[in-house]
A protein has these predicted regions:
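Solvent-exposed helix-loop boundary motif
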Residues: 25-165, 177-182, 192-200, 239, ...
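Extended surface/linker regions that mediate inter-domain or inter-protein docking
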Residues: 114, 211-346, 352-353, 357, ...
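Primarily short, surface-exposed interaction patches in extracytoplasmic proteins
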Residues: 146-181, 186-221, 235-283, 343, ...
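Extracellular glycan-recognition modules
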Residues: 269, 283-288, 417-449, 456, ...
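Carbohydrate-binding surfaces in secreted/extracellular proteins
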Residues: 335, 561-585
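Extracytoplasmic low-complexity segments
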Residues: 382, 387-471, 509-515, 589-592, ...
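Short, aromatic/His-centered strand-loop micro-motif at the edge of beta-sheets
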Residues: 533-558
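Extracellular glycan-interaction patches encoded by glycine-rich segments
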Residues: 595-616, 632
Length: 1018
């Protein structure tokens, strides 16, 4: 019977199963493509990952298990394959405003098509697929295409296949001048000069395009251009922000970025050095400078600011910035609660925060403008760096030599306490101060805070003592120069009148604007415990110890603190009544010398003094007393001394070998410190075991840590599992991010570079690869490029070279009628990219055309009217350059992962009236006027200089008409020359009348700068 069927019909019958399969595939709902966008946009806000804000009805729709489990009501939201039992279907089609989903107050009703998608999806089994961006990328073979002679690179076949499927054909190649302008702007941010265009057009060699791209990639301009987008991500600025908005000398980090791009530092190292350069073995100065990426957030020194609040804000900013820059995720949404859309919990956020909060730091800026620690010293030359290494080695050798000195055999029969340089008996006081009992010693002056009559004479241990009110106190104005290598001893009888939360007993730190400004020697009572410190800047650059036990209230105790000048916490000791007491180390990282302030007692400006506390018999030595001397000072008999105290005293006072070794060590330390202090300090990261633990903060509030939710350092396992072999620190985080199988890191940077070349990313939401992201237009291409990028050594220049030499990039940008109708946004890339230049490119182009661009690479930032490239323009966070803001640059207060182009009348006003553009128009007019005197040729040359092409006849005619109109207008306005000065001695210059032709030509040049041809790359 089959043989009776005609051949044509027989072929149709054979094709039926294939056609049915195609129809079935077309009808099959894809979860990631069709369903997830609907659920994410309409449902996840109430039924998503966030459990903290009371997930509605206990229903979770972002995962299969949650969507298909039975609810307390007895209903099941989704029963795969069963529409009648799936409560979601009934809710979608309900007309009751109290029952329908999404609820009317969301103002996002589902369309009929969206309801149909969800219905068919459930009917087909409600299959859940993981979000595409959380699946490791894999390489795909280039698809077959019809126009096989068009692709120049395998990536072109991915583009062409999509275009052909959409019924589009690729555009013809752009002319060579257009391509040259396009590629020059993409790779360097500057257009080619007329001479460069002429040279390229004259090069007819087979590899002319490749040679030009290689030259652009080798230019210093390349790194300057690529750095701008990274500076947006890193929130680079030249001031700290907030009210004071003080100067922030951050440009060494910017210069590191320039060098990294120009030297083609592999992206995995680029990432690692910025996140954790300080944790690399034998970290170099440059690698530590790179970590300033984490320190570029805003800070303040404003009085009344709470250090912990701003410390937490800074850490949160670091987490947010790293999330955007390296993962393309909005992780900051999980600061207050579990992420509404992405599988990032609040614990995940604070585990990341533990990575970035590993600093021993203060949340506030030092009031005096010093670099807030931790920091790295910026030595200018290899010789200076080598000298520092030698001096460090010398300190290490001296420490070993000191520890190698054998125990002393010497003994001292009698211990004599040295005479102090200050002794204040405090038997009485006057309005001017208190007497110093040391012969020739100057009295302690009354510090004019509070009133002397507020002090009280009370019975002391030896005669009278003084009880303080917390405001008034005394200052030893001639007792200064207490350096980090200067030994010191303080002793006094002390009585607490109350359990002070904080009380200043002694300090040389000047006035107080927060712990971050404390600098000098300091003895505090902190919640009843004694804290003895030598401080450069608290808390990172300090040596500090604290008693384990609290002082009793109301009892006299003789407190003695000694410091041996070693810059180490081990050199600090505390004694009570002649006996050393147990202490714990609070800080042990003293990096620099304190400021030179006078010694003050019981008072400090803007801080709590020794309120209701009493002092008697204050003594100060410019040396560190030994334990035996302290015991003798208190009258303890040698028979009561701890074992070994006498031998230690003999070692310190009578052992010549030990004294020589100690002097050599202190000399080595001083020489190292002196050399280090010749180099400026610069912001860096430095891991510290003394960093406070990280807890989940309720609603993200700094003062509401949930102590039962300690968060060790970690990363979201829902994004990519953590390898247990990795260290739980920033270096481990960078290794986790640069794992070749990590689903986000390579995709995010490849997509960002694609967007730089083509205007839009393969994923349009370059800043967001989470569940709210746009789907990739060419997912297989994105994955393949990401895999190739990693396998090629994370080579940024190689990837950009590949993109700009592709047939896709070389296309003309003018759309055909069919392309305009089928693909108005150019998603399928059947034509070349059209890009509005950034604010930096527009400004730099004007300076280059005018011949005034100063091409100095690197160095300190310049003011807006300077003629350097725009990335060097001084960026004040509270008042950014207005011309840049108008062209969509940000304030750099926070990370800006993407600039959104706008078109406003203000942009034309900037181009026509901004002083820099006005001056550039004048310079360009003068330049072309020296080449030719013919107005038409002048206009044509000006246009060609700015726009890198010949003006079209209509453009040239319009500009000539403008020139003629402006020349006539100016000629009519020019006044007659003023009469000569009557007095030959008059120094006043005679105004030269304006040249109508030059004024008109200048206005034509300004118009060219403001034209679409100038501000657009086509």
């Amino acid at each position: 019977m089959y043989g009776l069927i005609p051949m044509s019909c027989r072929r149709s019958v054979l094709a039926l199963p294939f056609l049915c399969a195609i129809a079935a595939a077309a009808d099959l709902v894809d979860f990631n493509r069709d369903v997830r966008p609907i659920l994410s946009d309409r449902c996840f806000g109430c039924h998503g990952p966030d459990a903290n804000k009371g997930r509605k009805a206990g229903l979770r729709l972002d995962e299969f298990a949650g969507a298909t489990k039975q609810l307390k009501s007895g209903d099941t939201a989704i029963v795969p394959g069963d529409l009648k039992r799936s409560a979601v279907i009934a809710r979608l089609n309900n007309t009751d405003p109290d029952e329908v989903m999404p609820p009317p107050e969301l103002h996002r009703p589902l369309s009929a098509a969206e309801k149909d998608i969800l219905t068919r999806w459930i009917a087909q089994g409600a299959k859940y697929d993981p979000h595409w961006a959380f699946v490791s990328p894999k390489q795909h073979p280039a698809p077959p295409v019809k126009a096989t002679d068009w692709p120049k690179d395998p990536l072109d076949r991915f583009i062409l296949a999509k275009a052909e499927a959409a019924g589009l054909r690729p555009s013809a190649p752009a002319d060579r001048a257009t391509w040259l302008r396009r590629v020059s702007l993409v790779l360097t941010g500057l257009p080619p000069t007329p001479a460069e265009v002429e040279a390229f057009l004259g090069d007819q060699s087979a590899d002319a395009f490749e040679k030009k791209v290689d030259a652009l990639l080798a230019s210093p301009r390349y790194g300057e251009h690529l750095a701008v987008a990274w500076m947006d991500l890193a929130r680079y600025a030249d001031t700290w922000g907030y009210t004071g908005d003080n100067r922030m000398f951050a440009w060494p980090w910017r210069d590191w970025v320039l060098r990294a791009f120009n030297e083609n530092l592999p992206y995995d190292r680029f990432l690692t050095e910025q996140l954790a350069g300080d944790l690399l073995p034998d970290a170099t100065q440059d690698q530590r400078v790179a970590t300033a990426f984490n320190r570029l957030h805003r800070m303040t020194f404003e009085g009344g600011s709470i250090a912990e609040e701003f410390r937490q804000d800074g850490i949160n900013d670091r987490v947010m910035t790293a999330g955007y820059a390296f993962m393309g995720l909005t992780v900051e949404c999980a600061r207050c609660h579990d992420h509404k859309y992405d599988p990032i919990s609040q614990r995940d956020f604070y585990s990341l925060a533990a990575m970035f909060g590993d600093q021993n730091e203060n949340g506030l800026l030092p009031y005096h403008g010093e670099v807030p620690p931790p920091f790295v010293r910026l030595f200018k030359s290899d010789e200076e760096r080598a000298k520092e290494r030698r001096l460090r080695d010398a300190v290490t050798a001296a420490e070993r030599a000191l520890s190698a000195v054998p125990p002393t055999e010497a003994t001292i029969s009698t211990v004599t306490v040295p005479t102090p340089v200050v002794h204040l008996p405090l038997e009485t006081f006057t309005k001017s101060g208190v007497d110093n009992a040391i012969a020739g010693g100057k009295p302690a002056k009354f510090e004019r805070r509070g009133a002397p009559e507020d002090l009280q004479l009370v019975p002391g241990v030896q005669g009278q003592a003084i009880k303080f009110d917390g405001d008034a106190g005394f200052i030893l104005s001639d007792f200064r120069q207490i350096g980090r290598f200067d030994p010191l001893t303080f002793s006094a009888f002390l009585r607490l009148g109350e359990k002070n939360a904080r009380a200043t007993v002694l300090h040389s730190t000047g006035f107080y604007t927060g712990d971050g400004d404390a600098t000098g020697i300091e003895l505090l009572v902190d919640h009843g415990k004694l804290r003895w410190s030598m401080i450069h800047l608290w808390p990172n650059s300090a040596a500090s110890i604290e008693t384990v036990d609290e002082l009793p209230v109301g009892a006299w105790r003789r407190v003695t603190g000694t410091y041996d000048g070693s810059s180490r916490a081990a050199g600090l000791h505390l004694y009570l009544d002649g006996r050393e007491v147990p202490t714990k180390v609070i800080r042990d990282t003293l990096h620099a010398k304190p400021r030179d302030n006078a010694l003050e007692i019981a008072t400090r400006s803007r801080d709590a003094g020794f309120r209701n506390g009493s002092l008697d018999e204050i003594q100060v030595w410019r040396q560190a007393l030994t334990g035996a001397e302290v015991a003798t000072l208190h009258g303890l008999a040698p028979t009561t001394w701890p074992a070994g105290l006498a031998r230690e005293h003999a070692r310190l006072r009578a052992d010549a070998a030990y004294a020589t070794a100690w002097a050599a060590l202190q000399k080595a330390r001083r020489e190292l410190a002196a050399h280090q202090e010749t180099a400026p300090a610069f912001y860096a990261m430095e891991h510290s075991p003394l960093a406070p633990p990280t807890y989940v903060l309720t609603r993200g509030d700094y003062d509401k840590p949930e102590k039962d939710k300690l968060c060790p350092p970690g990363a979201p396992a829902s994004v990519y599992p953590w390898d247990p072999k990795l260290s739980r620190d920033r270096l481990g985080l960078s290794r986790w991010l640069t794992d070749p199988r990590h689903p986000l890191t390579s995709r995010v940077i490849v997509n960002r570079l694609w967007a730089q070349v083509f205007g839009n990313g393969l994923v349009a939401s370059t800043e967001n690869f989470g569940l709210q992201s746009d789907d990739p237009t060419h997912p297989e291409l994105l994955d393949t490029l990401a895999v190739d990028f990693v396998r090629g050594g994370w080579n940024t220049k190689a990837l950009l070279r590949r993109l700009v030499l592709s047939a896709t990039f070389r296309q003309a940008s003018t759309p055909t009628a069919a392309a305009r109708e089928k693909d108005p946004a150019n998603r399928w890339l059947a034509r070349g990219p059209v890009l509005r230049l950034t604010s930096e490119m527009i400004r730099d182009q004007a300076l280059l055309a005018a011949g005034t661009l100063v091409e100095k690479v690197g160095g300190d930032s310049a003011q807006e009217n300077a003629r350097r490239r725009s990335l060097y323009t001084f960026r004040k966070r509270t008042a950014p350059p207005d011309s840049m803001l108008i062209f969509d640059a940000g304030s750099r207060e926070v990370c800006q992962p993407r600039r959104l182009n706008t078109n406003t009348p203000l942009q034309a006003l900037v181009l026509l009236n901004n002083p820099l553009f006005a001056e550039s128009a004048q310079k360009l007019a003068a330049k072309v006027a020296t080449v030719t005197s013919n107005p038409r040729d002048q206009i044509a040359l000006a246009f060609r200089t700015v726009c890198t092409r010949e003006a079209r006849p209509t453009e040239l005619t319009a500009l000539e008409r403008l020139y003629a109109d402006q020349k006539a207008l100016v000629a009519a306005e020019v006044p007659a020359p003023p009469p000569p000065a009557p007095d030959a001695k008059t120094k006043k210059a005679v105004a030269k009348p304006a040249d109508p032709a030059m004024v008109a030509l200048t206005r034509v040049c300004a118009t060219v700068f403001a034209s679409d041809a100038a501000v657009t790359s086509r």
